[in-house]
Amino acid sequence: MKISITAPAKINLSLDALYKRDDGYHEVEMVMTTIDLADRLYLERLDEDKIVLDVKAHFIPEDRRNLIYQAALLLKKRFDVKMGVRITIDKHIPVSAGLAGGSSDAAAALKGLNIIWELGLSIEELAEISSEIGSDIAFCVYGGTALATGRGEKISALPNMPGCWIVLAKPSISVSTPTIYKELQVESVEHPDTKKMIESIKNGDLDGIFASTGNVLESVTLEKNPQVKRIKDRMLAFGAEAALMSGSGPTVFALIKQYSRAKRVYNGLRGFCEEVYMVRPWSEGENDTNK
């Protein structure tokens, strides 16, 4: 059996860290949505008991360091699967960008393996299993727009993000998420209004969504990397209605109602930043798993 499955990137419309927990993680409230910048996974069931990864990108491991490999290994051990799999990944999501590319690939792998290994697991079961690999993966299993709490693994679905244009820009730097969280001072940063963001999404209120964006991690990443702030400022100068860093960075995204203005922001960033994308929100109903 062979199938293919889409693995969309995500952005954080709001990201709040409330306090540091006893287990070392931060208690978070994040409103996230998937976008139509996506990787594509191709899965082939093998009779031989082995996991084979083929990543069409440089600098990405094809062994146990890869979240896809970890997802496959977890399912094999949990359900005593004797079959194998070959997974080919066509990468489009930037690496180490704050867009959950690795987590989305792992989520897509879990969903694809559930099909080709005929495990019969529900989405809820896959999301629960995914939390053993990484905090962001549960959201990526569901896709669409949702509130994530706990350390990011508790997911509450929200209505789809209203239609708009999203311009992404990733500078050629890498950011360490653990380092950013370690240096975050939750008592001294401005916290986003998560309730207002949720209310605006439920009402389909784009202006309310734009006004409610916020990310507590910006205070750390922008201080360490001034180029991230320059990208954000440039987006706003070219007409973005909102601009925000996604995750721990370094990618910044702009939210814009009109195509013409979005194109202006996009053109204003090309040449200023190496990786620039113009995309739309993506909902779970668009997930085309093909056998």
Swiss-Prot record:
EC class: transferase
Keyword presence, Kinase: yes
A Pfam family that the UniProt record links to this protein: GHMP_kinases_C
Active-site residues per Swiss-Prot or TrEMBL entry: K10, D136
Ligand binding (ATP): P94, V95, S96, A97, G98, L99, A100, G101, G102, S103, S104
Gene Ontology terms describing biological process: isopentenyl diphosphate biosynthetic process, methylerythritol 4-phosphate pathway; terpenoid biosynthetic process
UniProt GO molecular function: 4-(cytidine 5'-diphospho)-2-C-methyl-D-erythritol kinase activity; ATP binding
Biological pathway: Isoprenoid biosynthesis; isopentenyl diphosphate biosynthesis via DXP pathway; isopentenyl diphosphate from 1-deoxy-D-xylulose 5-phosphate: step 3/6
Matching InterPro entries: GHMP_kinase_C_dom (IPR013750), GHMP_kinase_C_sf (IPR036554), GHMP_kinase_N_dom (IPR006204), IspE (IPR004424), Ribosomal_Su5_D2-typ_SF (IPR020568), Ribsml_uS5_D2-typ_fold_subgr (IPR014721)
Enzyme Commission number, as recorded: 2.7.1.148
UniProt keyword list: ATP-binding, Isoprene biosynthesis, Kinase, Nucleotide-binding, Transferase
Residue ranges of the TM segments: none
Catalytic activity: 4-CDP-2-C-methyl-D-erythritol + ATP = 4-CDP-2-C-methyl-D-erythritol 2-phosphate + ADP + H(+)
Family: Belongs to the GHMP kinase family. IspE subfamily.
Function: Catalyzes the phosphorylation of the position 2 hydroxy group of 4-diphosphocytidyl-2C-methyl-D-erythritol.
Protein name from the UniProt record: 4-diphosphocytidyl-2-C-methyl-D-erythritol kinase
Organism: Listeria monocytogenes serotype 4a (strain HCC23)
Lineage, top ranks: Bacteria, Bacillati, Bacillota, Bacilli, Bacillales
Chain's gene name: ispE
